[in-house]
Amino acid sequence: MLGQMEPAELQCTVAVERLNPAGQAIKRQLIRKGTVTLGRNEFQEMILRVHDGKAPQNFMLRDFQLFTRFAKDGKCTVKFVPENTQVLVSDCPPDRLKMFLKTLSIKHQASQSSKPLSDREKLRAGLPRAFETVSPLQLKDVEKANELRSRVNAPMQPRCLAERPVNKVLGDRKQVKRPRPDCDASPVKALHPNKKPVLVLPVAQKLSKEQTAVLNAVLSGKNVFFTGSAGTGKSFLLKRIVGSLPPKSTYATASTGVAACHIGGTTLHSFAGIGSGSAPLEQCIELAQRPGVLRHWTSCKHLIIDEISMVEAEFFDKLEAIARSIRRSTEPFGGIQLIVCGDFLQLPPVTKGKEKANFCFQSRSWRKCIHMNMELMEVRRQTDKTFISLLQAVRVGRVTEEVTAQLLKSANHCIERDGILATRLCTHKDDVELTNENKLKQLPGVVRMYEAVDSDPMLVQTIDAQSPVSRLLQLKVGAQVMLTKNLDVQRGLVNGARGVVVDFQPGNQGLPRVRFLCGAVEVMKRERWMFKAPGGLYLSRQQLPLKLAWAISIHKSQGMTLDCVEISLARVFESGQAYVALSRARSLEGLRVMDFDPRVVQANQDVLIFYKRLRKERLLMQSSMNDFVGQSNKENSRW
């Protein structure tokens, strides 16, 4: 299984190129299903081994260059300078490649303390040829690498040429001083002789047992639907799933542009290429056969769909039929593995007509497409058990006297602090825009404008649909703002963090300085967001990672955690909307509910019946579930 591979081993597409003195490829061997292994030979020298299933090729990791700009897309290049050869890795699960590169970098750095043997010494040793895969990274490797770095960082002492440090991973000194623009900073900078940051042992954020169960089910090839209440780590798990699958055949999608941006994907409608999907099936199949769209459908082996609750049943059935038709397969969804995520007790499907839209689980093809239904039970966003219980009750439409009393009492909460006001969650987009515009106008002082830099101004509408930041941002001193990107998790500078503009830097740019609720004061600089467009095109937007935060819509708040939030539920018009709004708050103390009416708390009865059936089936299937979970899931609420 893919998930059980060693961190020093990759399964991917590999190309081995022999280069002429000008750096051009004169011979190329392509291995579609190759294995790349990091190991040591009989002299404990580090070796990169490429195996095509027949005969291995070994490359000495001595004088080489590492190009990792596209590591996030599962690609990297290792160039062996003396041999005039380069190994190009592609279609590798990004998370696995990231760990492989860190292992290579730190292990190589740690091995520089030993003096290399000469060819004569190797002949005299007479050792039989050997190859052993390197062990996983340990603390001693990091400590050894840091010790060597500290020596390099020490003041230079006069020395003879014979005392020069042995080869650098990045090649000769000229290349180190002027690194190529396609060299990513992560593993390369870690080995830069002039800049030696302290290394730490790379540790991925640990998955819970139930999250691990979902990941293992996905890696075993099952079609999986996993659900859970707000704050159970669904989006976090989806990112781990995306990073664990081969990029070329994996398509991450979501029902909304904002949700798609969170997982680094595109909208489901953009992937499908059939517009709104309202056309007859035959016409939709024709639309999906256009060259750019057809490539999506034929190359896709793993389709991820986030926020499935907002996907309508008829649209899902059409996609399933299109997949079978285009891929010429009778298997459900044309044999594509489905990884579906969402909470049907949150926002329902969007429909423009008066006719009621059905949920995905009510579609004809749902049961034959989904092999496993799994539920995340552990709430991670909130830690207060009382607040968690309140949210669980609201989620299923159960409003007790105690819940009502707590929410009515919250109207008196004073949640403003250090000039940072509560963000008002609104049910309608128009209310949000009007509130933010009026509040900004009421502030004294000059408006500062910040225009986004887009990679393709002709496709600005596509970017707008997926971007968490606007084309034009207007700010004043005192403007209430919200961070739209994780900048420094340790300091609390995370997506959704609240702040206020305190001043602007002098000069043409006039960058804003923001004081955040966590206590940090930060000068905000432009950040870049990448988006996937139809046809495999990548788009980008550079903008300040801020948005006005006097008000925000409930739809736009999905996936966010807010420190101080004010909610008016008077105009709630959809089932699940009240729950989504309330569950954005990190704590009950940071929540203020105005004009609360228990009648606005609604849960769709069809969804409740579906979840009850899902839980019964899960209990019946528990013996097979244990293969993935290791132990029975515990429930934290009773319906």
Swiss-Prot record:
Reactions that this protein is recorded to catalyse: Couples ATP hydrolysis with the unwinding of duplex DNA at the replication fork by translocating in the 5'-3' direction. This creates two antiparallel DNA single strands (ssDNA). The leading ssDNA polymer is the template for DNA polymerase III holoenzyme which synthesizes a continuous strand; ATP + H2O = ADP + phosphate + H(+)
Listed transmembrane segments: none
Family: Belongs to the helicase family. PIF1 subfamily.
The encoding gene: pif1
One GO process term, biological-process aspect: telomere maintenance
Cofactor(s) the protein requires to work: Mg(2+)
Enzyme class, UniProt record, top EC level: isomerase
InterPro entries reported for this sequence: AAA+_ATPase, DNA_helicase_pif1-like_DEAD, P-loop_NTPase, Pif1-like_2B_dom, PIF1_helicase, PIF1_RRM3_pfh1
Family annotation (HAMAP family): PIF1 (MF_03176)
Gene Ontology cellular component terms for the protein in this record: mitochondrion; nucleus
Keywords, in A-Z order: ATP-binding, DNA damage, DNA recombination, DNA repair, DNA-binding, Helicase, Hydrolase, Isomerase, Mitochondrion, Nucleotide-binding, Nucleus
GO molecular function, one term: ATP binding
Subunit structure: Monomer.
Protein name according to UniProt: ATP-dependent DNA helicase PIF1
Protein localization: Nucleus; Mitochondrion
Residue ranges the UniProt entry marks as DNA-binding: 577-596
Free-text function comment from the UniProt entry: DNA-dependent ATPase and 5'-3' DNA helicase required for the maintenance of both mitochondrial and nuclear genome stability.
